[in-house]
Amino acid sequence: MPADKPTPEGPFWDRAIHLAERGRGFTSPNPTVGCVIVRDGEVIGEGWHHKRGDLHAEREALADATARGNEVKGATVFVTLEPCAHTGSQPPCADALVEAGVAEVVIGCADPTEKTHGRGPKILRDAGITVRDAEPDAVKRCRLLVQDFLKRAATGRPLITLKMAMSLDGKVATRTGDSKWISGPESRQMVHRWRAEMDAVAVGSGTFRSDDPRLTARIEGEVRQPARVVFDSHPLVEPGAALFEDIDSAPVVIVANQTTPSEKLIPLRDAGAVVVVSRGLDAAARFCDALDRLGELEISSMLLEGGPTLAGAAIASGEVDRIEVFVAPLIIGGGRSAVEGQGPDLISEAINVPHMRVSPVGQDVLMSATLKEW
């Protein structure tokens, strides 16, 4: 099949999307947004939303054009997300574009939230500015930028990425529970980068018991640490756990069952943890209820790191959006499988994972798939 034919606007979308990616991990619960301003086929200003509370991409692009000495009146604006029309931590971007006198605004992705949807384009059109959607390929790419934002807007729940590291025979630990390390150093470093891009990182009681993890993103450069979530079904978490060593910079959220005694939860709250109680008749239902509570905490994306019981509940819930599986060149035998739970009775009832992407990471192989798009 021949490659997609390049379009004249393609390079501008390439740049806007690249700029938007710079904000990943810092803007939530706001979406990542990039913007370029173009005149006569040349970029005269560009910007992106750096972090929550900072200038939005359109306003930064306008300021950048001015700083370069470029006139924006009559220019075309390419922005990955519909310009906002409400006042939050920043004034409306639609108003700024009207005041600047731009001639045209091309939008990569509509904003589905009630406070914004359609309002920014209406302000622009009422001011005589041409507004149009990007070409289909650019729309798809811009939507992929903000999958977490789109899912939480649609469902109130965070986008879920399930990460697993297993041996060639599908084991995540030996029969004694030893799992350090199945994946190689390159894979583990990649996971630290993913943590830095997510709002939250989660493990279950079993992983907490065996590893006492910190779940922080340990990479160079500026990092906004994710919230650390423990689905503490047994319950096992105590205030002396390693999680609490970084609580000032990385919040701790404990998801308890409705049967957990209140006296177990009081010390955790006193130590600074946020405690939410999930309800439901089975593990999958409790997982869904927990996602509702986490969404209320403005968590838009979450990396599930383990273990098999939590992975089984997540898959059974139907809430997993993406899967990242590291397969190491090891054969363990015995041990624990990557996903537990009841599972289907028939192979025909198994989950079909479409369009797997396979890439080498050090000595490991990374298999990636998107189960849902928003």
Regions picked out by a protein language model, each given a short descriptive name:
Residues I37-R141, A227, Q258-T260, A313-I315:
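Zn2+-dependent cytidine deaminase-like catalytic core
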Residues A16-A20, G41-G47, V139-A154, E245-D248:
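A short, flexible N-terminal coil/short beta segment enriched in small residues
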Residues P2-P31, S89, L159-T161, M166-W374:
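Enzymes that bind and transform nitrogen-containing heteroaromatic metabolites
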Residues R15, D64, A96, L144-L145, ...:
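Generic alpha-helical secondary-structure signal
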Residues F26-P29, G53-D54, P121, A127, ...:
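Proteins enriched for Cys/Gly/acidic motifs involved in redox and nucleic-acid/cofactor modification
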Residues G34:
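Helix-turn-helix
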